[in-house]
């Protein structure tokens, strides 16, 4: 029995040693924890009105604690409509290498979802924001987390949540953690909908990244929102990559970008919040629905190695500055 015990221990060590030769050593998390997050499934109207009567649900977050001691900075990673994909893992390793822990949320599995690309109506567009604030509650009390240095980063639908989680109005309604995110880093977010008081954002930097060729969530709309935010004196910047389409940082994406005929996009819609809690299709003057004629299919998605590398370089430099890393 002793020899069997020794074999069982030695084999993982051999495998780990082999992996360590391929993965930069600092990219290996010192510890990984899975945390349950108690949240709600809400309609957009419920979210916008602060209505807590949604369906209780438990989602999961993967906390990868970077190598280091004491309390470390954390980047919360929020996936998009396709779920927890390869880019989340890549970013986790890249950030761990800097000495930054990561908390990657899976907002779908606990809700019985795998993706909403082909049916965006399955989940409220802003529901992820509640998940993110609840994740803050988990992190704020964790002994290995510096609660003053928690950054939010999200992709596509998760980028939309990242961007609008900065709104002071939404923080007042839903953030009960006692802390705020130190910065917001949305990747290719949906900026299509003006919300009431949407220029009143947290006094924290916002850095948006997207591609000129994005026909899922056009960056032109984000640039217009950025101009409104700047006019209001906010610290916000947008970085645009001319050759990049949607999801350009996913290393398993199509090369070149390919059409996904079943995926829904609101790129042709003009949606706005007219009265608190009510999203209106500006063309029909009726409440917006994903059955509206403006909703189209077939955006391009694909990996752009050059844009992905440039974005990694920019994000790392930004995080080093905002988190005061040595």
Predicted regions and their residues:
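Hydrophobic h-region of N-terminal signal peptides that target proteins for export
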Residues: 12-20
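Primarily recognizes the serine-hydrolase "nucleophile elbow" in alpha/beta-hydrolase
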Residues: 124-202, 213-216, 220
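Short beta-strand/loop motif that positions the catalytic acidic residue
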Residues: 208-210
